[in-house]
Amino acid sequence: MRVDPMNNEIIEIGALKVRDGKVSERFMEFIKPQELISPAITGLTGISNDMVASARPARSVITDFIDFCEEDILIGHNIIFDYSFTKCTAAREGLPFEKMGIDTLKIAKKVHPELESKSLSALCEHYKIENKAAHRAYFDALATAKLYQTLSHYFEPDNPKTFKPSQLTYKIRKPQPATPKQLALLERLTKNKKTFSHNTEAFSCNA
């Protein structure tokens, strides 16, 4: 299943703050999407359309999440994936979102070259870390926090640079007008009775 921060929506944000090794604050909230949640996403996450029916819109939730983050460093597993969605959502609402971050996936690749899989689930299994609801935002965040603490305990003394935060970067691509070749292809497909939800004049591609 391929998702793209430019074309797909966030339906849930989950995060937590850790102070002195303990969870001090939590952020858990659904976002009301503009389109219906697909059966594939429901199958993966367990989140249904009924669950988000009364959720707040993206602008309201993302504003509160940015306030929640304050100046803290973000930690995530393949963090650029989550950061790209959050940044794109914020940008659509005219809100800035620039953060420093630490990626537990990059750390795992450095300190565990012998492991075939460095996915969050595989690493949690390796270290016997419980994840009560995999693919749900808050529980994945909690599992990642525990994973980071574990990796830091075992490996940071000998690999301090690996655990240093860095600036998270994701360039939001500006839509570009479709090329004449693309428009001609769409017209041919339309004549062959292939249907699209896009008006050809409004169709765009990302550079």
Region locations from a protein language model:
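Conserved non-catalytic scaffold segment of RNase H-like nuclease domains
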Residues: 1-99, 113-135
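Active-site catalytic microenvironments for nucleophilic, acid-base chemistry
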Residues: 89-92, 110, 126, 147-154, ...
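Acidic two-metal-ion nuclease catalytic site recognized across multiple nuclease folds
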Residues: 147-206
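A short, structured active-site edge motif that brings together acidic residues
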Residues: 99-109
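Acidic, divalent-metal-coordinating active-site segment for phosphoryl/phosphodiester hydrolysis
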Residues: 136-149
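A broad detector of short, well-ordered amphipathic alpha-helices
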Residues: 12, 122, 139-142, 188
